[in-house]
A protein has these predicted regions:
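Catalytic active-site module of serine/aspartate enzymes centered on a nucleophile-bearing elbow/loop
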Residues: 94-138
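Short beta-strand/loop motif that positions the catalytic acidic residue
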Residues: 66-67, 73-75
């Protein structure tokens, strides 16, 4: 599974909450009258606050340590995707690989990153799918 972890940046602690309260939340409420900004606030506070407020927002370090799924991390260092979080994920996940960084700063690097992603996905294709493709090729 290729990943670019979205996580906490200590020098910008309210970044994700504030961005979503300004952008995503009002747009969601406009499309869904059954959802209020108070509900959005509760959701975002749960997502970006508390125990998750120092790592990847959607999982814990213990989850990553125990994750047996192969992952390919493509580090970045933009506000919502801190380099430190990406590299900690690589160190914690037992079946993690890391791509090169920076990988999207110049157009000539993007094809290399895409090649790395494709190679990773081919190497970790589920067995049943690989057998089907091999049988189809014969």
């Amino acid at each position: 599974m290729p990943a670019q972890p979205s996580g906490y940046r200590p020098e910008m602690p309210g970044l994700s909450y504030n961005n979503n309260m300004k952008g995503w939340g009002p747009e969601l409420c406009a499309r869904r009258p059954d959802i209020t900004m108070a509900m959005v606030d509760t959701f975002l506070t749960n997502m970006y606050g508390g125990a998750r407020a120092d790592f990847v927002y959607t999982v814990t370090r213990d989850f990553v340590r125990n994750c047996q799924t192969p992952i390919l991390v493509l580090p970045d260092d933009v506000p919502g995707h801190p380099y430190a979080v990406a590299m900690e994920t690589v160190h914690l996940a037992p079946n993690a690989q890391v791509s090169f960084y920076p990988w999207k700063d110049t157009p000539d690097k993007i094809p290399l990153a895409v090649r790395h992603i494709r190679t990773f996905l081919r190497a970790h294709r589920p067995v049943a799918a690989a057998r089907s493709m091999a049988a189809a090729a014969q």
